[in-house]
Amino acid sequence: MLSPAKTPAGIRAEPLVSLENVGVLRNGRWLVRGVDFSVSRGEIVTLIGPNGSGKSTSAKAAIGVLKPDEGRVERKAGLKVGYVPQKLSIDWTLPLSVRRLMTLTGPLPERDMLSALESAGIAHMLDAEVQHLSGGEFQRALMARAIARKPDLLVLDEPVQGVDFSGEIVLYDLIKSIRNATGCGILLISHDLHVVMAETDTVICLNGHVCCRGTPESVSRSPEYVRLFGSRAAQTLAVYSHHHDHTHLPDGRVQHADGTVTDHCHPDDGHHAHEHGHAGHEHDHDHPDHAHPHAHEAGERHA
């Protein structure tokens, strides 16, 4: 198993990566602008937002895959990053074992390989062919591959995409156990605007900029939810309440309080009377359901 590496109690962990007023411009259009957040050792930060809101772009800027056009990104010296992409292109007609998957980007000591697979709960599948794995098992294999080289920061792009509800619970429990065992920081990207991993320390809602941020509210307080999905789900998932002055439309555009509609919103676009700086506010609008994943590929980088 992986050995714990936690920050001593009472000492605030130094950020592994921090973004300050980051903007990424492509073809004359800002994909994201004015993005600020940080991830520290042992911390779980979840980025949520509709399709095309800049979640993957912000994560890539954080780990250095994309260079921001404005603002700055600071990373801990010698930062090691483990990355689980949203989509991994594999020719499923070719034989590929879990063992081979683990070493695609370079050799890996057998001990470290087995330790990572054991942490992911699939050590018994070392010689299994990946095309025979279920969606949840394949995600576990990708997580094992990401943690095998003992990263400081683990970036998970839509880790529960394509997995059924019970599989989501299992994978979120796995992410929690990885964080607890290693003390690594975790940057998690989710397309679900309302339900997030309960262990999340900070939720950041993006739609071209940081719309709002806060902490999740545990769904375990809802007897109806427990009756529907069970106590384990209630302990693993949490509801995040948004608190901003605009509505995310189903197509990803933004409807402002004055009724105007734009592709994205930004604090300096003239539509915002003020920005909220803390969680727990009520608001007078709802988010339509955006629970459909986007399909663009993510660039891959491993520790």
Curated annotation (Swiss-Prot):
One of its GO terms (cellular component) is plasma membrane. It holds the Pfam family ABC_tran. The keyword Metal-binding does not apply. It is an enzyme of class 7 (translocase). Its EC number is 7.2.2.20. ATP binds at G49, P50, N51, G52, S53, G54, K55, S56. Keywords: ATP-binding, Cell inner membrane, Cell membrane, Ion transport, Membrane, Nucleotide-binding, Translocase, Transport, Zinc, Zinc transport. It is found in: Cell inner membrane. Residues 263-303 are annotated as: Disordered. One of its GO terms (biological process) is response to zinc ion. GO terms for molecular function: ABC-type zinc transporter activity; ATP binding; ATP hydrolysis activity. It is a peripheral membrane protein. InterPro entries: AAA+_ATPase (IPR003593), ABC_transporter-like_ATP-bd (IPR003439), ABC_transporter-like_CS (IPR017871), Metal_Ion_Import_ABC (IPR050153), P-loop_NTPase (IPR027417). It catalyses: Zn(2+)(out) + ATP(in) + H2O(in) = Zn(2+)(in) + ADP(in) + phosphate(in) + H(+)(in). Residues 17-232 form the ABC transporter domain. PROSITE patterns: ABC_TRANSPORTER_1, ABC_TRANSPORTER_2, ZNUC. Belongs to the ABC transporter superfamily. Zinc importer (TC 3.A.1.15.5) family. The complex is composed of two ATP-binding proteins (ZnuC), two transmembrane proteins (ZnuB) and a solute-binding protein (ZnuA). Part of the ABC transporter complex ZnuABC involved in zinc import. Responsible for energy coupling to the transport system. This is Zinc import ATP-binding protein ZnuC. It comes from Rhizobium johnstonii (strain DSM 114642 / LMG 32736 / 3841). The gene is znuC.
